[in-house]
Amino acid sequence: MSSGKPHLNLVVIGHVDHGKSTLVGHILYRLGLVDQKTIQMLEEEAKKRGKESFKFAWLLDKLKEERERGVTIALTYMKFETRRYIFTIIDAPGHRDFVKNMITGASQADAALLVVSARKGEFEAGMSPEGQTREHAILAKTMGINQLIVAVNKMDATEPPWSQKRYEQIKTILGKFLKSLGYDISKVPFIPVSAWTGDNLIERSPNMPWYNGPTLVEALDSLEPPPKPIDKPLRIPIQDVYAISGVGTVPVGRVETGVLRVGDKVVFMPPAKVGEVRSIETHHVRIEKAEPGDNIGFNVRGVSKRDIRRGDVAGHLDNPPTVAEEFTARVFIIWHPTAITVGYTPVIHIHTASVASRIVEIKAKLDPRTGKVVEENPQFIKMGDAAIVRFKPIKPLVVEKYSDFPPLGRFAMRDMGKTIGIGVVVDVKPMKIEIKTK
């Protein structure tokens, strides 16, 4: 595997049974960084059960089981390589915690692949009000995924098979919906494919001579690599803090924005502790500077392990991370059994922090499709609603405006073990905190 290629994170979304697993399985089978031995083992097992059961979805399920049993393919099982990129598929389709993982974006997706079935009735089910085609597309947009590819799947099962008319119909209906979410449709390829037969996945389909756009892999190769926000102020949400004997305090986290250099003075917020960076490591290699996307451990002098914790954020003294007295956000309610009113206090999961935050005002209810205000100061909001809401964290929490620092400005609301909603921060009222520099 040539490590020189840039890495892209791809999230695969779409309605249940529209063929996500089969499609991913087929691509992994053809391009995946899965060793031959594993593939052979799976194929032999398939032969034993009768050829028909070697479906690509079944391959994916087998790989998932292997991963859960901790077999060696754990790391590579969801990676595949194209001419230009190495792709990591975030979250295999059908994952229970799919929505939660997509939101908190532990590994933020650079692009989304939306799989829709062209089979009669199936496309319509995905587009119904409770359809996942709609829900996942809304989520992707809310979470800041601006690069989208649509795979119009099961083209072998249209009436008649390989129907251009059905493809055009889906492209029109779905295109209109995606446009209403704010996607630039001229940049969204719609690729007619069959995950089952492999048509238009890697090679051109002889069954659809009417289509002259890219194959799925060509479309994946034409995605843009994510920009590195090095010119923004430094932000490093802390994942863990270690005290290493003979070294000292070592916070660990991913640089989201800005650049960290050896010798820099940094401040950890909310505790307002200041330290000096003595060394930086990434994957056990010493480096002089760290940039966005780097997962690092850095040794700081002047700060003890007791002073800082997971959920704190490191920045430079001239532009410290913002601690919120209150923050205002655009939220979308995914699930709630009754109604949400002022006083409701879900746990806000934002960057590496999770802090209960009270709703102190529901400013407006929005049309989830257009974002326009439909009601000022509503009494309550419920499942399926979008709204502008003001929160007060019950203990100090670093929150930034989404427009300034996207990874520190999007969050999930959790309660009762479920994701209640997702949100993006539109405004922050900062808490006044004095930073003592010795």
Swiss-Prot record:
Region (G3): 91-94
Chain spans, region G2: 70-74
Segments of this protein annotated with the region G4: 153-156
Subcellular location: Cytoplasm
Residue span of region G5: 194-196
Swiss-Prot/TrEMBL catalytic activity: GTP + H2O = GDP + phosphate + H(+)
Binding annotation for GTP: 14-21, 91-95, 153-156
A cellular component annotation (GO) from this entry: cytoplasm
UniProt region (G1), positions on chain: 14-21
Keywords, comma-separated and alphabetical: Cytoplasm, Elongation factor, GTP-binding, Hydrolase, Magnesium, Metal-binding, Nucleotide-binding, Protein biosynthesis
Binding of Mg(2+), residues: 21
GO molecular function, a single term: translation elongation factor activity
Superkingdom field: Archaea
Pfam family, one: GTP_EFTU
Known EC number: 3.6.5.3
tr-type G domain sequence ranges: 5-228
Top EC category: hydrolase
Keyword Nucleotide-binding: yes
Cited InterPro entries: EFTu-like_2, G_TR_CS, GTP-eEF1A_C, P-loop_NTPase, Small_GTP-bd, T_Tr_GTP-bd_dom, TRAFAC_GTPase_members, Transl_B-barrel_sf
Family: Belongs to the TRAFAC class translation factor GTPase superfamily. Classic translation factor GTPase family. EF-Tu/EF-1A subfamily.
Role played: GTP hydrolase that promotes the GTP-dependent binding of aminoacyl-tRNA to the A-site of ribosomes during protein biosynthesis.
Protein name: Elongation factor 1-alpha
The gene coding this protein: tuf
